């Protein structure tokens, strides 16, 4: 958490400094007063250490050894020779030293170890060792002798004060640290109620709206939101009110979090960032407490922005999913609803949230007054992809054969994250080959790696298996070329990539937002082309078509159940029984049609798949010679691009192979 002062507009329009948010746990450091530097914790520790040393000194001075006056060894021999000693108690230690404590038959003037004299009948003397000869000498002189096992001063000290030392250590090093007194955001029972939001200053984030592309409408909406905070008078003059919240919706990788970073870089106000998962813990009430603490910090630093990433972790619809609602999550959501638009209003505090699961969010969270604006961020179109690629390649050296426009055309369906990964993979490939510039070949190899997976050339495949794979992929290629409405082929390979032994890659010429019946049937037909080719050539089929069959069945079932493309069943939605319950708002999926209708659905799905399979058989039977030639060349070269495929197969009813390169 930074304590850098961030400037924000004052009432007079000047730029003043706002107070940095106090770190978690209150006063940072041990014995630190308000305003003291972080180094203030060290004097507290030294004070504790000095107190311990003082206790040790007092013990050694007043409680160690014996309370009798200590005399010199020569004085001890003198009183012993004069037969003044009546009894002696010997305490022996592990280092063989001993302390002799004795009594005299009458008070005598004795010389102490500090060279002074004292009239006393008691004494003590330290000797390096106590032997049997010394014991016999004392016994012969009629001295009563008693021998005890003594303990060292340190052991005695620890025995007396160890419990207190341990307690003090626990207090300073455990409890105070766990309560956050050292300034750290400790994740423990004493700081559970504290918000874990990180405050970001304008000096920390370098990302701005100039670093974001392909989402022009979203940028426009968010720029207006930022302007609400920096120049509210412009909107207040005509009665406009600042929006309470902005919800960013869209699939993963489209730039929702990047937009939040850009807001932090553009807004000259405090910016609090937190994940939705950081609210809920194992203890009840923690989530609601953290929401309260977050908004309290935000109010102290208003105007400001709060960003909650993956808000579906805490904003899920109440009472949804298996087992009913989660009480702790519901309490957290209720507190969030109150803070956003409850009895008390939060002026000049805007909440921005991001999610890729808007379908599971609670309806109370989505209403106007809380999230006033819902901005959808979808995958970019060709112009958006071109703008994104220009941003990601502005610091990379490109060869003259790289055309960004062509590269954008050859990457339909790519999200912003996919495009960033594409540029990075191309740069890594160029660096691997000691290149100075990134070429079009590098981009093509990187795109193939993303679409088809990395090559596994080290994997050993027998000639028989390679031949089977070649005919399977050749079947896909020929059926696709001779089926109307199909996607153009980009590349075919029998080099193992990812988890597959071979692959046929398709690359549409344009972005598709809707699919007609002809296109869907073409997808099913060329998906089954590999299975049909195996049956025609080898008179048997293999497990290699398992994924193709799964995809074909899924498309056919959706055509009948969801998209109303069955002539006998009509345009009726029969639901999707394959969707997991916990991903939606329903407790369970109820089949809303009869057994007879279910049977009709199965029959329609089977008819669609079998019809497409017959079409694939017809194509391959007519093109059997081309199939053998294509498979043979594929076995020899292992990979064929679009131009090579077109030279072998010639034109067909479907789309021509797509020869586009970067």
Curated annotation (Swiss-Prot):
Cofactor(s), by name: Zn(2+)
Taxonomic superkingdom: Bacteria
Ranges annotated as spanning the membrane: 40-60, 155-175
Keyword entries, A-Z: ATP-binding, Cell inner membrane, Cell membrane, Hydrolase, Membrane, Metal-binding, Metalloprotease, Nucleotide-binding, Protease, Transmembrane, Transmembrane helix, Zinc
Record text on cofactor binding: Binds 1 zinc ion per subunit.
InterPro entries: AAA+_ATPase, AAA_lid_3, ATPase_AAA_core, ATPase_AAA_CS, FtsH, P-loop_NTPase, Peptidase_M41, Peptidase_M41-like
Coiled coil: none
Periplasmic side: 61-154
The keyword Zinc is annotated on this UniProt entry: yes
Record's bilayer topology term: Multi-pass membrane protein
GO CC annotation terms, alphabetical: plasma membrane
Record: residues binding Zn(2+): 472, 476, 548
Location of this chain's protein in the cell: Cell inner membrane
Ranges annotated as biased composition (Basic and acidic residues): 1-15
SS bond list: none
Quaternary structure, from the entry: Homohexamer.
HAMAP family (UniProt xref): FtsH
Entry function: Acts as a processive, ATP-dependent zinc metallopeptidase for both cytoplasmic and membrane proteins. Plays a role in the quality control of integral membrane proteins.
PANTHER family: ATP-DEPENDENT ZINC METALLOPROTEASE YME1L1, METALLOPROTEASE M41 FTSH
Similarity comment: family membership: In the central section; belongs to the AAA ATPase family.
Record protein name field: ATP-dependent zinc metalloprotease FtsH
Organism of provenance: Pelodictyon phaeoclathratiforme (strain DSM 5477 / BU-1)
């Amino acid at each position: 958490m930074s304590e850098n002062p961030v400037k924000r507009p004052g009432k007079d329009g000047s730029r003043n400094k706002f107070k940095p948010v106090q770190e978690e746990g209150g006063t940072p450091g041990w014995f630190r007063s308000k305003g003291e530097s972080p180094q203030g914790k060290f004097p507290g520790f030294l004070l504790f250490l000095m107190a311990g040393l003082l206790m040790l000194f007092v013990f050694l001075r007043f409680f160690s050894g014996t309370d009798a006056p200590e005399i010199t060894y020569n004085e001890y021999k003198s009183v012993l020779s004069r037969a003044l000693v009546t009894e002696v108690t010997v305490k022996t230690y592990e280092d063989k030293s001993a302390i002799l404590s004795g009594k005299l038959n009458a008070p005598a003037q004795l010389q102490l170890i500090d060279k002074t004299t004292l009239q006393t009948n008691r004494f003590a003397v330290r000797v390096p060792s106590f032997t049997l000869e010394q014991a016999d000498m004392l016994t012969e002189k009629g001295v009563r002798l008693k021998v005890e096992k003594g303990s060292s001063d340190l052991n005695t000290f620890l025995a007396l004060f160890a419990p207190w030392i341990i307690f003090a250590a626990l207090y300073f090093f455990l409890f105070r640290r766990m309560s956050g007194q050292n300034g750290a955001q400790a994740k423990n029972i004493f700081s559970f109620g504290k918000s874990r939001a990180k405050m970001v200053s304008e000096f920390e984030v370098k990302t701005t709206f100039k670093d974001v592309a392909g989402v022009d409408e979203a940028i426009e909406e968010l720029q207006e939101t930022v302007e609400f905070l920096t120049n509210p008078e412009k909107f207040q003059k005509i009665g406009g009110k600042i929006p309470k919240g902005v919800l960013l919706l869209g699939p993963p990788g489209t730039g929702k979090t990047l937009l939040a970073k850009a807001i932090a870089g553009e807004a000259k106000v405090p910016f609090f960032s937190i994940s939705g998962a950081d609210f809920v813990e194992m203890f009840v009430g923690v989530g609601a407490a953290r929401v309260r603490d977050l908004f309290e910090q935000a109010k102290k630093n208003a105007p400001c922005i709060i960003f909650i990433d993956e808000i579906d972790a805490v904003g899920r619809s109440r009472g949804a999913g298996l087992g009913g609602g989660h009480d702790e999550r519901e309490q957290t959501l209720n507190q969030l609803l109150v803070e956003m638009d409850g009895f008390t209003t939060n002026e000049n505090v805007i909440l921005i949230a991001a999610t890729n699961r808007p379908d599971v969010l609670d309806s109370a969270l989505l209403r106007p007054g809380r999230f006033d604006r819902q901005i959808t961020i979808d995958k970019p179109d060709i112009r958006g992809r071109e703008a994104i690629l220009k941003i990601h390649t502005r610091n990379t050296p490109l060869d003259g054969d790289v055309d960004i426009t062509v590269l954008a055309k050859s990457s339909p369906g790519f999200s912003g994250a996919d495009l960033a990964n594409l540029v990075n993979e191309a740069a890594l490939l160029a660096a691997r080959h000691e290149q100075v510039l990134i070429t079009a070949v590098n981009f093509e190899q990187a795109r193939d790696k993303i679409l088809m997976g990395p090559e596994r050339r080290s994997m050993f495949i027998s000639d028989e298996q390679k031949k089977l794979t070649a005919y399977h992929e050749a079947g896909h290629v020929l059926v696709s070329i001779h089926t109307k409405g199909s996607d153009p082929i980009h590349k075919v390979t029998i080099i193992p990539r990812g988890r597959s032994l071979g692959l046929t890659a398709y690359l549409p010429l344009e972005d598709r937002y809707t699919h007609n019946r002809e296109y869907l049937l073409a997808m099913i037909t060329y998906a089954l082309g590999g299975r049909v080719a195996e049956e025609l050539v080898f008179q048997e089929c293999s497990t290699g078509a398992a994924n193709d069959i799964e995809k074909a069945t899924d498309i056919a079932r959706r055509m009948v159940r969801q998209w109303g493309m069955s002539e006998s069943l009509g345009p009726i939605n029969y639901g999707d029984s394959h969707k997991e319950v916990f991903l939606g708002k329903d407790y369970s999926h109820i089949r809303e049609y009869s057994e007879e209708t279910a049977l009709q659905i199965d029959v329609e799905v089977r008819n669609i798949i079998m019809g497409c399979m017959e079409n694939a058989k017809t194509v391959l039977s007519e093109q059997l010679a081309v199939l053998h030639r294509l498979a043979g060349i594929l076995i020899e070269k292992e990979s064929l691009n679009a131009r090579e495929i077109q030279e072998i197969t010639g034109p067909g009813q479907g789309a021509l192979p797509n020869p586009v390169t970067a």
